[in-house]
Structures are given as structure tokens and as C-alpha cells.
């Protein structure tokens, strides 16, 4: 297998109208997906999308390519990414496709693909699709077109699935929950699930207009959520990203609870309930405080490369069931085959009930190390790997920050930027080193 040109950390993503998110490419992509993934007994592919204004247009183009191969489609409409994973498996489809730009602004969009078992494609299958895209598009025999149909009441199907993962007597009536749906794919489903389970729900960002997805809201911008949690004296806040596969939480005091803390809370509960299999998979970004906290509990930790697919693959390799990214991708393989913000939230709420503890109490059982994150957006790529100053930092940072420290500098797989993470025990030193690295990269 050689270098993947289009598929990155989480599918294909980019600005709409700029290669590869163009009509020509998506037509061929749909055709290629139909040929590579659609040829089995069922010959049907699920398609869902988030609330972006470009979603229906891109869906139509992609669907034409798929139908032209003789493969039929089942349209789910606007649904969370994790719902498409569930439908792909439960409806016995050949594949599932999500048209979403995740946490990116509205002018970006992308394609995520699930295999028939509801998990993200392997790199080998992605390569096969890319190879087919290079071929000349063959105009179809119209008699052999696939058929386009809608999934009947997809919201109810997915809501039932989420609920069935938890005890029938789960009662959230003691909680006031602020839900920030980022004007994205969870805007209908999330409020209904939590209300059905008895919670008092106050909603934020549930009025999508096609261009306000993730705008001053969602898992990457929780300032508004923090303010509302405090002003409403709520028990907690939940912020999903645009396609609903991430969640970041806010406790009743307005403190952020990220994916690292969430997976620690869940792992400790699974250990207590004797449900834990092996340990926890994280990434190179997982906070050192969480790793040390898991170690104290006797829970092994294994890092995977960045990306929820990489986390999933490492969990399967280790034959474990838990994994997470700091950004809020929480994988609970005993409940679902992919990251799911709603299911992760319900598990934390169940843990709060079982232990008679607030989210603040649960998340403060570990001491997080100071971390500083910077995104350096670039107009053109910069070869920072060969810069002597950067290399000196990457080899000698422990002399500055101490042994319990880390420095990571990497290219983003989803945006045109360099991501910097500096971690250590002294916040001032961590902050100063992060700023120095950022300035150095900008001057390259």
C-alpha cells in the first residue's frame, strides 16, 4: 500500500468547492465506493449527513455515483455519525457514509465511511477506493441503476438503540442538563433522549440554518455552555460537535471535563462493576495525570496514534473495550462500534447516579498536568521537522520541563495547521515553551 492522497485522519475533508470536495470528485468517489464496497448480497449503502448547507448537494452527487453502479441507497437524513455506524450494521448494509465536516466551520465538509460491520474503513480499503477513483468513470446502463429509499423513522431507531445500552430503570429526573448541540446533527435526537429519561433539559444551539454549525458552540467552543450552566445552576453541561461523535462536559462549577477525564471516570466505574476488560487506549495527547491515575488503579494504558479509528484499532488489537481522545471521542466497544457522544454522556450520568457523586467529584479524583495547545494555521506547508531549533527542543525539552513532561509537534490530519502540545508540572514553563515553539514555526 502506498501514500493515501485523499483519505486523512478521519475520512476525506476540505473546503467545499476546492479539491477534493468538488462535484467531479464526489461523483467518482460515489462510483468508486459502489464498486469497491457495494458488491455483496445486500447491495445497499446508508447515507447520512450533518446540518451544513452543502450537505444535500454533496449527498445528491455522491448518491448518483453510487446508484450508477447498481447499488441502492438508504437515506437517513440529518443524523449523528454514530447513528450511521449503527444503521450500517443493523440494517445489513454494504457500507455507511456520513457527509460531515465534524467540528470544522460550515464552509468545510467531508466524507466518513463505515464498513458493513459499522467500523471505520481500514487504510487498505481506503487505498482501494482511491485507486478506483483514478479510473475513467463508466457511464451506466440505466436499466441497472440502484434504487434510492429513505430509512423509516431513523430518529426513533437510534434513540431506542441508545436507551437499550443502559438499564431500563435509568432515571435522570434529578438532573438539570444543559445540552449544546452545536447546531449540528444531534439537534433533534439528543434533547429527546435526555428528556425521555426524565432530565430537565435546557438546550443551546439547536436551530441549524446551514451556516451556523459549530458557530460559537459545540465541543470546541464551550464558553457559552459554561456561562449557561452557572446561570441556570445546572448539574452539568454536555457539548457535542457538529456530527455528534464527540462530547466535552462542563461540571456544575463551570469547569471543563474533557475526553481524558471522561474515560478515566468510565474506566474506574467499569473496574468497580467488574466490566473492565484489560485497560484503556488513549493517544500521545492523553494527559499524564490520567495515565498515572489509571496506573494507581492497576489499569493498563496503551497509546495509539491520533484519530478515533486508530484508537479503535488499538482497542481491538489489545482485545480491550475502552478508549478515548482528549477531544471527546469516547469509544465504548461493549456498547457501540464507534465513538458516540450521547452514549458516553449517558454512561457518565449513570456513574454519577451509582456513586452519588457530582461530575466535579468524579473528575477531580485525578490531578491533571498543565497542558498548552496551539494551532499554527499555515498558508503553505512548512518543513518544521528539519529545523534545527525545533529538533533541539524536541530532544532536550525534559531539561527545561522535567521528567514528567512531553512536547508534541505534528501536522493536523483535518485542517491546514501544525498542532503543538506541551505538557509538564510547571504551567509557566509549559506556556513559555509552547509560545516559543509556535513563534519559531511561524518564522520558518
Swiss-Prot record:
In its UniProt record, which GO terms are filed under biological process? carbohydrate metabolic process; peptidoglycan biosynthetic process; UDP-N-acetylglucosamine biosynthetic process
Any one GO MF term held by the record is: phosphomannomutase activity
What UniProt keywords are attached to this protein's entry?
Isomerase, Magnesium, Metal-binding, Phosphoprotein
The answer to whether UniProt assigns keyword Phosphoprotein to this entry is: yes
Q: How is it modified after translation?
A: Activated by phosphorylation.
Which SUPFAM superfamilies does its entry note?
A: Phosphoglucomutase, C-terminal domain, Phosphoglucomutase, first 3 domains
The record lists Mg(2+) as bound by 102, 241, 243, 245
Q: Which residues cross the membrane?
A: none
Please give the cofactor(s) recorded in the UniProt entry for this protein.
Mg(2+)
The catalytic activity of this protein is classed by the Enzyme Commission as: 5.4.2.10
Its biological purpose: Catalyzes the conversion of glucosamine-6-phosphate to glucosamine-1-phosphate.
What is this protein identified as?
A: Phosphoglucosamine mutase
